[in-house]
Amino acid sequence: MHGLSRLGNGSSNGRINIPSPSPPSSPRIRHTRGKSLAGGVYKQGLGERLVFLLFSIVFRRKGVLLLAPLLYIAGMLLFMGSFGFTVLDLGHGVEIVYRRGSPGSVYRSPKVFKRLWPVMEADVNGSSHNVLMEAWKPRVKSVWKPCISTNVSAAGSNSNGYFIIEANGGLNQQRLSICDAVAVAGLLNATLVIPIFHLNSVWRDSSKFGDIFDEDFFIYALSKNVNVVKELPKDVLERYNYNISSIVNLRLKAWSSPAYYLQKVLPQLLRLGAVRVAPFSNRLAHAVPAHIQGLRCLANFEALRFAEPIRLLAEKMVDRMVTKSVESGGKYVSVHLRFEMDMVAFSCCEYDFGQAEKLEMDMARERGWKGKFRRRGRVIRPGANRIDGKCPLTPLEVGMMLRGMGFNNSTLVYVAAGNIYKADKYMAPLRQMFPLLQTKDTLATPEELAPFKGHSSRLAALDYTVCLHSEVFVSTQGGNFPHFLIGHRRYLYKGHAETIKPDKRKLVQLLDKPSIRWDYFKKQMQDMLRHNDAKGVELRKPAASLYTFPMPDCMCKEPDPEPETDPA
């Protein structure tokens, strides 16, 4: 073994701070005095003018500065009252803050839907076929195409040792760990051992790597660039008494730079012959040299394909969606609907405002996050979360948005989701708007799904494949699933994500207006669709992930030999 790495002469960056892929904590309320959506201008009330007058007196007359604390408290009380806040003390230092009457702060979408439904039902102008065919405007002159081979170097002849990682989380968190591990193994000129999957307490899926991904194809696809083995050789295992846990587990910083790996990990690898990182999640910086980025591209977009049982059923499901959507040229819409109980609970948003819902959500938060939401000083702001676009969209809101964009009741819609919170109640309006709606449970037979039951990652792989091949993909909330899927769609569809990411701040404002006109709502939704089309092709920024933005690291811009023409 030798100490050569594959960093080359490329410079490396230090640690990069980027937003966490998991859902953020509740945001602070943003007090603004700008124009509202309806164009109204905020005016100062009598209470606020009194507060400012008192403060001006204090700062002009130094003799009354001792009264400042009392005046401050009195002013804050007036301020809170004038802005319409209600504070509910839950005890143990936890408070829920409501801001009464703020546009968009309350879930009023069912009232809007009930009033608009007769108009929506009667609106047959245009056809869903045309919307599906014309949702994405033709690209002209040039397109983005995969060009991974130009950025990837060959594997070294002599390995520096064995690199072992443990991947945790759900399907796409594991995918992230695998692809980054390939890049690190290439950087260190190490042999990668097929990653070990950790049994996650949330996902509860005991699947191994080979149950989800095609092991043999993974090894073959990487063979020219990174050495991969299914398990450690017998002589190495003997040194550690056949116990992988005895191998040194390195604790690495999040978002570590290539230089960090060469300075801290490579010497240990050369000395010991094998190193382990458990867990290995978000342990490599986004900005690395081009040939290391190329390994990420190769692993994610080419080497990782699902295991044959998943692949075969997923292909059948896609074929069935295409057959059912024959009237629209085999095109369909897929929606990643994040309205499971854990997502609703974590968001700290409210929907029916009943005591039963509150108790249910409190219990769900305690089960999943053990006191995180009961810490002293924690302030929960459901209204502010909704105004700020942090609340998961309900099935009803997704349906209204799509109908407003022009997708009518003949549109075939596939919903990718886990167990929807109160599914009978919340899914009914979406089915009413889109009666041809499909899920994996309606698209596949119980016998076909039986081997996948109890394995959330394998079920997610079925959803991933059906969404990947849809004409339009709708992402309703953040997370690793849409992040990877959007990047994969860009890789397949000439750089365009062909994805709708709703402007939820705008949407909650519109759905807070019971008197809103259907034609006005439609115009706003169609503007939103055009905006998503315009943002479909985006290059990766320094602090962004190539798994979502594969250009320019994994794709090259080329002239389009067959430019698409506008049917008009």
From Swiss-Prot:
Pathway: Glycan metabolism. Glycans are attached at N125, N151, N189, N243, N408, N409. Belongs to the glycosyltransferase GT106 family. The chain crosses the membrane at residues 65-85. Residues 1-33 are annotated as: Disordered. Residues 1-19 have a biased composition (Low complexity). Coiled coil: none annotated. InterPro entries: FucosylTrfase_pln, GDP-Fuc_O-FucTrfase. It comes from the Eukaryota. The keyword Transmembrane applies. Signal peptide: none annotated. It is found in: Membrane. Its EC number is 2.4.1.-. It comes from Arabidopsis thaliana. It is an enzyme of class 2 (transferase). GO terms for cellular component: membrane. Keywords: Carbohydrate metabolism, Fucose metabolism, Glycoprotein, Glycosyltransferase, Membrane, Signal-anchor, Transferase, Transmembrane, Transmembrane helix. GO terms for molecular function: glycosyltransferase activity. This is O-fucosyltransferase 9. It holds the Pfam family O-FucT. Substrate binds at H336, L337, R338.
